[in-house]
């Protein structure tokens, strides 16, 4: 599992398909059966959306939607990772 420290008391853990499949065993379909199908969205507020957008493009994340002002009050861009999960980088429009 890869862990990201988001705050002093908050970590985000991302587990590869094979790792979570061992834990879930036969209680759910194997995650590989749904590869490429969005199964979750990570919506991350960031300090510099343009920088995060450029970083995601640089590492080869699949662009889903460019940076846009959204009607819920955020500026957001969307990518998909190699497993098809959606990753959103967002900033509040009225900081």
Go through each PLM region and give its residues:
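Vicinal oxygen chelate
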Residues: 1-47, 53-80, 91-95
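Conserved ATPase active-site switch/coordination loops adjacent to the nucleotide-binding site
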Residues: 83
């Amino acid at each position: 599992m890869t862990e990201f420290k988001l705050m002093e008391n908050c970590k985000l853990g991302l587990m590869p398909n094979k790792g979570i499949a061992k834990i879930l065993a036969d209680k759910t379909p194997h995650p590989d059966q749904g590869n490429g199908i969005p199964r979750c969205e990570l919506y991350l507020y960031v300090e510099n959306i343009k920088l995060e957008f450029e970083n995601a493009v640089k590492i080869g994340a699949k662009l889903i939607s460019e940076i846009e002002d959204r009607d819920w009050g955020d500026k957001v861009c969307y990518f998909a990772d190699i497993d098809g999960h959606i990753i959103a980088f967002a900033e509040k429009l009225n900081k």
